[in-house]
Amino acid sequence: VTGVAETDGPTGATPLPRHHENCFACGDRPGGLRLRFADPGPDADGRPCVIGAFTVDAPHQGAPGLAHGGTLAAAMDELFGALQHHLDEVYVTGELSTRFHAPVPLGETLHLSAVIEEVDGRKLRVRGTGRLRTPDGPRAVSATALFLAVPMTHFVTHAPEGTEFRGRPLSVLGHSRERRARFVRSPGEDPQDRTEG
């Protein structure tokens, strides 16, 4: 499996850190996807984006010689998760809708891109595509998703001791006293007017 390595992102794109080393999609686990992502800057409409690349190997196949649909859906879910690097909140997948436009053969590289469509209170809406061979190649997969903001304690409760998230100890992040209200607000609302509760 290959991806956008931490040192070889596209020209002008900033490599993004992985979530944690044991992540099935972005960690370095045997049989995992080993995805890496980069920030190319905002799209033409000024919206935050992420990009990446994924080469399908034998552990990722469904039908003989083709990528499993669940593998491609997992890649899209992780791509959307990488968009969180643009935000001051953490989110979990609430809903993921994936469309398959063309088969993805083993050995083929899928070029991934995603954009934030909307942040509305706790809700984050995103969309993305996976294209064959080049970033402008034929569309093989597309997806939309709804993510929901959660406190870091959501992850601390289940994570093994010593787990790091984006390069920092999860236990420290989970006990942060910063208010989520500081980051999650309605359009036009002054975050200083929010009270903890």
Locate the predicted segments by residue.
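Hydrophobic beta-strand-centered segment that forms part of the acyl-chain substrate-binding groove
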Residues: 78-111, 117
